[in-house]
């Protein structure tokens, strides 16, 4: 007996916060805020990108940063997670792990801790509305100093068991090897968090082993 794929139970184990945004939501929020979207975001969807070379990665990161800039207030953050949970439910997913780097939003929401609490509140509301369980992964930016990663790992540890389930590492892996952030991962390990660094995207299999 065959079953439609959408009805099969699933878990989505790694989804980036801004990257989860619906395209119509991105366009709508940008219009309301007077933010100009380049053609690659406004019309062509999904954008045609190559992440395997430096130029392609730079373009991807630029577009991602522009998309993130439309999330300027709490209602937008709540909306993003609510719509994401709705999409997950429609696809048969009962569990979502969503990754966010709080430093990308801290300037507009009053700091790292208020940003984490906002994301957790939005995740809780989205879960309650849809029945989809949501765990939050706090991620560090590998292009920044490892000390910043330690700060984020400690912050993530403070919310272990209260919605935060993991600690990650993202951005261009050619500019920051995972081993350089070992101290941050030790902090996260002591807090009982999952370790979910990106690897192998641009630097090959060796970066996964590191």
Q: What is the predicted role of each segment?
A:
Residues 199:
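Cytosolic ligand/metal-binding cores
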Residues 1-193, 202-208:
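Metal-cofactor-binding active-site regions of metalloenzymes
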